[in-house]
Amino acid sequence: MCLVWVDWNSRLQFEWSDGDKKWVVMQSGMGKVRAASMCQMIIDTYQVDTFFEFGFAGGLVDILDIGDIVVITGVSEHDVPNRSEIQREQDEWRVRLFQASASSINRFTTALSADPNVTLTKAPVICGDMDVYNREVRDKIAMESGAVAVNWESSAIADVCAINNVKYVGIRVISDLCIEEDSGPIPKERIERLRRSTTAYVNALVDFNKC
C-alpha cells in the first residue's frame, strides 16, 4: 500500500492504492458549495465508482444519543423551498441514487455492525446551511421531514453523485441533539464517544475494501 499526500488548494487530501483499488480522501470544509465542488472535483479527477461521505450531524429525535452512527438512506433540505417540478425531478434523482447504492450501503452497514460499541440507525437526514440549537425548531423539522438528523452538506453531495451516476454511501455521527444545552464547548466524555465512532468508521472502510 502506497500513501501519497496531495494539497488541493489547502484541502487536506491523501490517496493510496490497494491492489486494483484506489482510495482518495479529501476534507471539503463546511457547507453545500464546498462539499459539492469537492465531490465533483474528485469524480472528474479520479472517475470514482463509489463516493463515501463522513461527518457529524445533529440528532433530531430523542432515540439518538451522542456518538450514534446514522447510515443515510435519503436526503432533503429544510432551508430551500423548491418549485414542485424542480423538487419532483430532484426526488427522482435521489430515489435512483439510493436504489443503485443499496448494495454498497448494506455492505458498509454490515461492516460497521461488527463493532459491538457502535449504535447504528439507518434513516434519512435533512440539510440546511444553518445550525439548529432550538428544540421547537428541531421537532418541527423532524416532524415535517421524517429525518432523524440534520447537517449542512449531505444533500449536495448526494445530488452530485446522482447526476454523475456514482454510488453514494453517507455516514454521519451524532455530535449533538440540536438543543440549546449542546451549543457550547464539547465535553471530554462526548469527544471520546465521537472518537470511538470515527474509529469504527475507519475500520469499516478497511473491511469494506476487503470485500
Kindly label every feature range from the protein language model:
Residues 131-183:
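A C-terminal functional module that forms or caps the active site or interfaces directly
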Residues 47-52:
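Proline-aspartate-enriched helix->loop->beta-strand connector
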Residues 30, 74-77, 173-176:
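Short, acidic/turn-prone active-site loops that include or flank metal/cofactor-
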Residues 24-28, 124-126, 171:
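Active-site-proximal beta-strand elements of phosphoester/diester hydrolases
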Residues 1-40, 45-46:
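N-terminal short beta-loop-beta anion/metal-coordinating cradle
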Residues 60-145:
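Mid-sequence, gly/pro-rich, charge-dense loop/helix-turn segments that line enzyme active sites
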Residues 168, 173-211:
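Regulatory input/activation interfaces that engage signals or partners
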